[in-house]
Amino acid sequence: MGRPGRKPRGRARPGLFPFPKEELRQGGSSPANLNAMSKGPVSFKDVTVDFTQEEWQRLDPAQKALYRDVMLENYCHFISVGFHITKPDMIRKLEQGEELWTERIFPSQSYLEEEEVLVKFSDYQDKPPKSIVIIKHKKLIKERSSVYGEALGKNRVVSKTLFEYKSDGKVLKNISEFISRDINPAMGKLGGSKEWEGSILTSKQEKTHPASILHKQIGRALSSEWDLAQHQKTQIPEQRFEYNKCDSSFLMTGVEFPHGRAHRGGGNFNYSKDDITLFEKSDLGIHPHDLMEKKCSSYNKYGELLCRKSVFVMHPSSQMDERPFQCPYCGNSFRRKSYLIEHERIHTGEKPYICCQCGRAFRQKTALTLHEKTHTEGKPYLCVDCGKSFRQKATLTRHHKAHTGEKAYECTQCGSAFGKKSYLIDHQRTHTGEKPYQCTECGKAFIQKTTLTVHQRTHTGEKPYICSECGKSFCQKTTLTLHQRIHTGEKPYICSDCGKSFRQKAILTVHYRIHTGEKSNGCPQCGKAFSRKSNLIRHQKIHTGEKPYECQECGKFFSCKSNLITHQKTHKTETMRFQ
């Protein structure tokens, strides 16, 4: 009936009628008053007096009858002046003479649409009595459920499925997805275990009194869920519960966190003082390391996580910012050990997952799974711009950015933008100096793994990319692509100043410096500047005296390869002269 947090407009001393009768009769909702109020926005709750659970229980039958008459009269007046509303659930119950029930929240907590409460549902007409303990609920806003064919109002609540147990292990109550008809269907949802079968009591064997919540351990019945909450507050102080099988601890007010269910195979919440246990159907067997609750928000003075009486508590080591597993090679940290193991394979080169059809190896099982699809499915994702096909839709999406020119990933240090996140990560290593990929042969380190792969071919002599025109082989595919332009004559890079074209973009960049006069490569010893880095390297050999190029005919050394080639031509000329 209305929101429990709203206070009546009048008060009286405990034991007296808690609102003035004159206020209801004279100032409540007569047609004249409603017509005057209709100049502004008016709702039915504006003419409704709400009671808390304690206030309602203090009313005697005559006072409850007076309240029923006044509220029904208010509703009739409200409709008579032209207000069109759905009949409130409270009015329906008053018309049928049913006993009202109210929600009750814990002290010092404001009413929230999604709040942890302890709720007691009493009998529903002639159906078997039911008592439901709800730890977390949400109000029904758009959807409506039904209980035994009767629609639930918007102020009703729905609950996760819980089972309440006594200290001797027997079932007291069973609650299905909203409100169950009987206890027996729970057997199928609990797996039909014989261990549970003997302990379950049907509603015929043990019925719960409509206005009480049984508390077997202390030997008395508590009159309301409010008394139960107060009793638990005094009997069960905030304490820390530890589970010694994995040395993990959890903190919750008077409730043992269902950590043990990961080890025992059952999901329970144990009130340690009174031995009442709530069992939850869902998520059985899930370790709480993987569970998180949105409402866990505060910490106590010891740095331990506190939670607001909810179904799940976040395990201390599953916090999003905690990364306890550190890579010994590069220092990167991870939340899970499995992530660290996969990451370490980058450094070790281990590839344990091997394709049984082609023998190709992978670091991750997911990569192997995607690869195996190439043998069965091919490349189903086709680019409409260039006709290239891909195995994965995500790869096609990234490829589209090459046509659109989109560069969504920007470096925060220098502002450079990239079309792929992996390119940005590689680029950022130029700022940090990190070189995680190391050659096992010579110890040289590289920023990119592809650069390491190409470098390793200098040790093995492997040149897998072969030109179909002349048969020349190359260790990089990009080098082969540049070489093939010699045969095709393609020069796609054109200078906007003079119109000259080039096969490589790098050569065009160097050519631009002729027009701009830029000489960015300066010698640190003499200050002479050059437009090309290769010219600077050649110049620096003058200072060092280095002459690495030797003539095989006469043994003379040169600092530049071009000078050696020019020199070798003199030997060929002399040979032709003597012939």
UniProtKB/Swiss-Prot annotation:
Keyword DNA-binding among record annotations: yes
Record region (Mediates interaction with TRIM28): 12-135
Keywords attached to this entry: DNA-binding, Metal-binding, Nucleus, Repeat, Repressor, Transcription, Transcription regulation, Zinc, Zinc-finger
Gene Ontology MF, one: zinc ion binding
Ranges annotated as biased composition (Polar residues): 27-36
GO cellular-component term (any): nucleus
Name of the protein in its database record: Zinc finger protein 382
Annotated source species: Mus musculus (Mouse)
Gene (name only): Znf382
